[in-house]
């Protein structure tokens, strides 16, 4: 039986930190679903369709990754995808409390759904999509933090 995992997020936009996590997840699980949340309340810069397209392009080198947009409750989405593992990245201790709350709620809603926490590689441990966008808005060089296709799309959005 294939072990299916979901790595959810808004990915607005997907960064090299996200790519680091999903790449390592592909080595742990047979199939990884990069689940891109619609998250309208976060007022994303990129549409859901754009974020899905950018993530698909950025993960083409990973044969066991499927990129899917979703707007459902995570536990319901996981059940529909036949996934039993939820991957979450933890950048700092500050992330842990919120992630623990989510993990407990997801387990309440779907007892067979395990949350697995991965720390990003040191190189990416301090970045977030929000930080990258903010630096780019002020003409800072964010090339190092984004896949090339994402960097081009971000620069086009900010032009």
Swiss-Prot record:
Any GO BP: coenzyme A biosynthetic process
Main EC class the enzyme belongs to: transferase
Assigned GO CC terms: cytoplasm
Binding site for ATP: 10-11, 18, 89-91, 99, 124-130
Site (Transition state stabilizer): 18
InterPro entries to which the protein is assigned, alphabetical: Cyt_trans-like, PPAT, Rossmann-like_a/b/a_fold
GO molecular function terms attached to this record: ATP binding; pantetheine-phosphate adenylyltransferase activity
Subcellular location: Cytoplasm
Keywords: ATP-binding, Coenzyme A biosynthesis, Cytoplasm, Magnesium, Nucleotide-binding, Nucleotidyltransferase, Transferase
A Pfam family this chain is assigned to: CTP_transf_like
Gene3D superfamilies recorded: HUPs (3.40.50.620)
Annotated metabolic or biological route of this protein: Cofactor biosynthesis; coenzyme A biosynthesis; CoA from (R)-pantothenate: step 4/5
UniProt catalytic activity: (R)-4'-phosphopantetheine + ATP + H(+) = 3'-dephospho-CoA + diphosphate
Domain of life, per lineage: Bacteria
UniProt-listed PANTHER family: PHOSPHOPANTETHEINE ADENYLYLTRANSFERASE
Subunit structure: Homohexamer.
Family statement: Belongs to the bacterial CoaD family.
Free-text function comment from the UniProt entry: Reversibly transfers an adenylyl group from ATP to 4'-phosphopantetheine, yielding dephospho-CoA (dPCoA) and pyrophosphate.
Protein name: Phosphopantetheine adenylyltransferase
């Amino acid at each position: 039986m294939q072990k299916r995992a979901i790595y959810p997020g808004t990915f607005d936009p997907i960064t090299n930190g996200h790519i680091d996590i999903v790449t390592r997840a592909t080595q742990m699980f047979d199939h990884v679903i990069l689940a891109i949340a619609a998250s309208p309340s976060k007022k994303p810069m990129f549409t859901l369709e754009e974020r899905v397209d950018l993530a698909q392009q950025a993960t083409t080198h990973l044969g066991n990754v499927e990129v899917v947009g979703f707007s459902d409750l995570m536990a319901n989405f996981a059940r529909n995808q036949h996934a039993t593992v939820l991957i979450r990245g933890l950048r700092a201790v500050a992330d842990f409390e919120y992630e623990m709350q989510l993990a407990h709620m997801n387990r309440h809603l779907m007892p067979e759904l395990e949350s697995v926490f991965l720390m990003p590689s040191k190189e990416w441990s301090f970045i977030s999509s929000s930080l990258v966008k903010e630096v780019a808005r002020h003409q800072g060089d964010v090339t190092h933090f984004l896949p090339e296709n994402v960097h081009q799309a971000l620069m086009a959005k900010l032009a």
